[in-house]
């Protein structure tokens, strides 16, 4: 036997599928349902001061489902015996797998050995014990009583991922007569990853703290703030994805801040700096990125710069994107200058590599990667339908580390959240067209 023979056998099968109760479910119905749910009672995540109903500036933002799209599909090898089991698997959570196998097979946990192999990409995808492939391998191994290798095809993996949750963001704000930002409201409508995985923990408590990360800790000095959350089950499997909810919330926050700066007639960098008196690490990250990017320099027609800053996983990152938008609305990212304050740095090259990887991954989700639902199933199957950023599309990237003696923070995820808002703000600077939906398509610039 070999893998190709198994794949040919799979393709030869004629299966009569039960399409289930969600056969008529599609992306439009999901969007409509989320919009309707947005009017429901929301759970408050943060409230400061007094929020009134007469806020004059409003914007709405949307972020689509997206896949982890790991280069190596899900796979494992398992050997099950009467009193022991041995598993070889690329995973980010070996202890959970060990416990689950022990429970499934009713054998002592000390008799379960999990070998963590090298993995062709994780990004949160390999945090799940039961992505079905391991439990399927166990059931097969029970029956054949021989070691079993189970491999998902790319199509299997793309259609049965645990996707980054889609989300809607409704933001409102007020500026004073002096154009100071005096009130901010952010309502997040999104599925809960934790609520889907452990619904028993959310029977009475409907606030998923993870879902408001990056929103409830808004760094700006605003006297009146309300951040709330509407948990919305879309019936689509969702999971942790690189930077988790920070990628959605940073996009909404930093594009709206840019809109407010424009409304106030203030430079986008200056507008942010004026509201970061209590956030020196945000300020220094912004200052460094802006300085290295040459913020404020004159650019040819059709080119623009945009910036964003965000804190996540104990680190701060600011990014300045420079883009070109052609007369045909084709978008090219020319350069991204990023700063990162991740505390004490042990391996600078490692930090820079992680930041570069985050930017590549962030550009894919900003410009390309989108999962849509048709007839109750994922429409995309492989990289011809779920496109990744290609080598010729990769911009020049410069990474600058903020010197710090603070405790170390993360490096593998904080570089991703600022990517989308920096690019969206740069497109506005180049074209005057606001971007409020991810991923960004050329057709979004045609209206």
Predicted regions and their residues:
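Cofactor-binding beta-sheet edge motifs in enzyme active sites
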Residues: 1-447
């Amino acid at each position: 036997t070999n893998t190709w023979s198994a794949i040919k056998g799979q393709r030869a099968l004629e299966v009569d599928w039960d399409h289930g109760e969600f056969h008529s479910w599609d992306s439009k119905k999901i969007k409509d349902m989320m919009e309707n749910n947005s009017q429901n009672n929301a759970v408050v995540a943060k409230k400061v001061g007094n929020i009134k109903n007469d806020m004059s500036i409003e914007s709405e933002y949307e972020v689509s489902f997206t896949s982890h799209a790991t280069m190596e599909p899900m796979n494992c090898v398992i050997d099950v015996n009467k009193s022991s089991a041995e598993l070889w698997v690329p995973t980010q959570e070996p202890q959970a797998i060990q416990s689950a196998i022990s429970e499934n097979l009713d054998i002592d946990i000390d008799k379960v050995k999990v070998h963590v192999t090298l993995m062709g990409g994780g990004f949160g995808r390999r945090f799940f014990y039961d992505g079905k492939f391991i439990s399927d391998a166990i059931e097969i191994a029970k029956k054949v009583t021989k070691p079993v290798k189970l491999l998902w095809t790319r199509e299997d993996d793309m259609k049965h991922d645990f996707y980054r949750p889609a989300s809607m963001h409704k933001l409102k704000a007020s500026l004073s007569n002096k154009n100071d930002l005096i009130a901010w409201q952010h309502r997040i409508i999104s599925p809960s990853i934790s609520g889907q995985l452990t619904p028993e923990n959310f029977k009475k408590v409907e606030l998923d703290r993870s879902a408001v990360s990056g929103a409830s800790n808004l760094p700006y000095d605003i006297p009146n703030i309300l951040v709330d959350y509407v948990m919305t089950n879309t019936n689509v499997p969702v999971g942790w994805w690189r930077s988790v909810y920070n990628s959605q919330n940073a996009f909404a926050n930093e594009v709206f801040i840019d809109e407010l700066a424009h409304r106030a007639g203030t430079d986008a960098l200056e507008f942010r700096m004026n509201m970061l008196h209590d956030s020196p690490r945000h300020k220094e990250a912004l200052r460094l990125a802006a300085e290295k990017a040459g913020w404020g320099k004159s650019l040819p027609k059709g080119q623009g710069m945009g910036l964003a800053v965000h804190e996540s996983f104990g680190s701060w990152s600011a990014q300045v994107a420079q883009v070109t938008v052609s007369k045909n609305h084709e978008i090219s990212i020319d350069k991204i200058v990023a700063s990162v304050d991740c505390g004490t740095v042990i391996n600078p090259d490692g930090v820079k590599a992680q930041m570069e990887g985050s930017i590549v991954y962030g550009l894919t989700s900003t410009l390309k990667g989108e999962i849509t639902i048709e007839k109750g199933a994922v429409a995309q199957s492989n990289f011809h339908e779920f496109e990744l950023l290609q080598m010729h599309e990769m911009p020049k990237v410069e990474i600058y580390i903020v010197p710090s003696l603070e405790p170390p923070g993360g490096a593998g995820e904080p570089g991703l959240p600022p990517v989308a808002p920096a690019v969206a703000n740069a497109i506005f600077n180049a074209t005057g067209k606001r971007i409020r939906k991810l991923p960004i398509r050329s057709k979004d610039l045609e209206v």
